[in-house]
Amino acid sequence: MESFAGKELQHSGAVHAYQLDGKGGITPIGEQDVVNSEKPCWLHLDSTLPASARWLNKTTLVPDSVRNALAGESIRPRVTRLGDGTLITLRSINLNANARPDQLVAVRVFITDKLIISTRRRKVLAIDEILTDLKEGNGPTDSGSWLVSIAESLTDHTSEFIDDLHEKIIDLEDDLLEQKIPPRGELALIRKQLIVLRRYMTPQRDVFSRISGEKLPWMQDDDRRRMQEIADRLGRGLEDLDASIARTTVLSDEITALMTEAMNRRTYTMSLLAMVFLPTTFLTGLFGVNLGGIPGGDAPFGFFTFCLMLVILVGGVAWWLKRSKWL
């Protein structure tokens, strides 16, 4: 891509539009500024805005095959080389308000040595973190270091979420050791979040590994080394995910066993109660048939004697159950 003027990047629909100064900071893009590899420009767009869609359709700075990709809804992380540019789709933990972290958000990037165009449909916190570093003068200096910074920030958020899920699993295990059954759906949600992360972070790890191995002209050897370290760190996170998924399976079995044991214990208790009161139920039914000649019917202490007999009978049955070790 040849050098171009800054006015080609200026439009009202941009979320962020800056030029990297090559020293870790940023400057506004001027209309007469010449954009080159030493000071690449970064344009961040919200692809849901009509102004961004119009700019993508008419700009000559990106290939035709990239326009729809930047404005679309890519599902899985991927990387595609297109001439001197590279199209990359990455996934981020959703840290927006009133959203579940496992409802991952996507960031799509077309990057060359002179131009970085990133798009999103929902806010990506990693973008804001990179922008903050740039405003403080501690950010990336070129296209390669920008991509490494984004990958590192995304992986940091993923690692933190994996650690949070790990802590939740430990809490569930501790509760089960204390014979506490977790609220319904809690384990299912954790397991779903683990599986979603596993589904999308595996290809994302592969994207990072491929970028580190590609001889991209706008990446330096140090950038490739850092990208490989990020891929390795994400790979270790995936191993933790596999272990956590296996632990949730064990937890599910333990919860089922605990609930079955509790149900059996209740059923056993009810059976013992029925056994204790079965003889008394028979006698009360026998003496309550309202027929003439009931024994003790005319005796002044007949009812008291009958109640005492029932108490003795219940006590005798309970003693027998205790002696038989059923109680």
Swiss-Prot record:
Q: Which UniProt keywords apply?
A: Cell inner membrane, Cell membrane, Ion transport, Membrane, Transmembrane, Transmembrane helix, Transport, Zinc
As its record notes, the protein acts as a catalyst of:
Zn(2+)(out) + H(+)(out) = Zn(2+)(in) + H(+)(in)
Please tell me one Gene Ontology term that the record gives under cellular component: plasma membrane
Query: What InterPro entries is this protein classified in?
Result: CorA_cytoplasmic_dom, CorA_TM1_TM2, MgTranspt_CorA/ZnTranspt_ZntB, Zn_transp_ZntB
Membrane spanning stretches: 272-292, 301-321
Compartments in which it is found: Cell inner membrane
Q: How does it sit in the membrane?
A: Multi-pass membrane protein
| Periplasmic side stretches | 293-300
Topological domains on the Cytoplasmic side lie at 1-271, 322-327
Q: Name one GO molecular function term.
A: cobalt ion binding
Family matches, as PANTHER family: CORA FAMILY METAL ION TRANSPORTER (EUROFUNG), ZINC TRANSPORT PROTEIN ZNTB
Q: What is the role of the protein in this entry?
A: Zinc transporter. Acts as a Zn(2+):proton symporter, which likely mediates zinc ion uptake.
Task: Give the protein name, as stated in the record.
Answer: Zinc transport protein ZntB
Q: State which gene encodes it.
A: zntB
